[in-house]
Amino acid sequence: MKIAVTGASGLVGAALVPVLEAAGHEVVRLVRRRPASTHELEWDPQAGTIDAAGLAGAHGAVHLSGATIGRRWTAARKAEILESRVVSTRLLAETLAALDPRPSALVCAGGIGIYGDRGDEILTEESELGTGFLSDVGRAWESACEPASAAGIRVVNLRAGIVLAREDGALARLLTPFKLGLGGRVGSGKQWWSWVALDDVVAAIRFALEGDVAGPVNLVSPNPVTNAQFTKALGKAVGRPTVFPFPAVAAKAMFGEMAEEALLTGQRALPAKLLAAGFDFEYAELDLALERALAK
């Protein structure tokens, strides 16, 4: 199958593309510069331009691009986080909807922040959505896919947890202090951190492309943990104690609103739809997932 991928140079995209190619798929990457090969197509979401002709014959698309949430949220940064997702998603969805024939599937990235802070509540794809900036972003992001679904394209809205990889993301940022023996819980440590191994993210995206799941899909391990449990497991994985907690007041002073929504609160999410569809998580346990991530 011909598969179009945005964000192919990012953490997930860089891991996904070789797997799709090894499975025999033809992958075309959407890039925001002049294409360097026949396997690249140029697009500029802010300008509203995309190489629609190059997408002809695509069987599916995976949309992974979007500004990182892992920095302090200024007003300008929040606008960039929202617009980078919504504008690009709408352009891609409208373009795919106008193709003849149309692709069969659009798999779009997203996050479990869409549920907001829910304490100990167990969250599945049937749970109500929450409130807050990340929830608002998630709603708008998923809504931007509507042109594709209205055209009959099967849309999969991934709601991913913390992706475990040493190359980038939350785990990469935690590694240095933890290796120095300076790691510990964040705030109370009682907040839930739903996580997922990078290998399982890649496998789940391929599963979504080739299968028949549709709508919101929680992309998280079946075994969420609290922040205190996560930090203890990470300390064990790197062979260091975890006796230096990061107080909530310090997190708020350093990261502002981002700390409130992304560090000090969390979601206890379960991958109900993936499990019901028969997806098998290779790294369902945190210790095994951390061992795999740190061995790469």
Where are these regions (language model features)?
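Glycine/proline-rich active-site loop of Rossmann-fold NAD(P)-dependent oxidoreductases
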Residues: G138-R139, A151-I153, L164-R173, F207-V217
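C-terminal amphipathic/interface module of NAD(P)-dependent oxidoreductases
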Residues: E260-K296
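Conserved beta-loop-beta element that borders a ligand/cofactor-binding pocket
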Residues: G110, S143-R166
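N-terminal Rossmann NAD(P)H-binding glycine-rich loop of SDR-like oxidoreductase domains
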Residues: I3-A23
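NAD(P)H-binding glycine-rich loop region in Rossmannoid oxidoreductase-like domains
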Residues: P35, H39-S88
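Mid/C-terminal beta-alpha module of Rossmann-like enzyme folds, strongest
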Residues: E210-E257, E291-K296
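Alpha-helical substrate-binding/gating segment
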Residues: L175-G183, Q191-P224
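Conserved Rossmann-fold NAD(P)-dependent oxidoreductase catalytic core, especially the SDR/UDP-sugar
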Residues: R90-G132
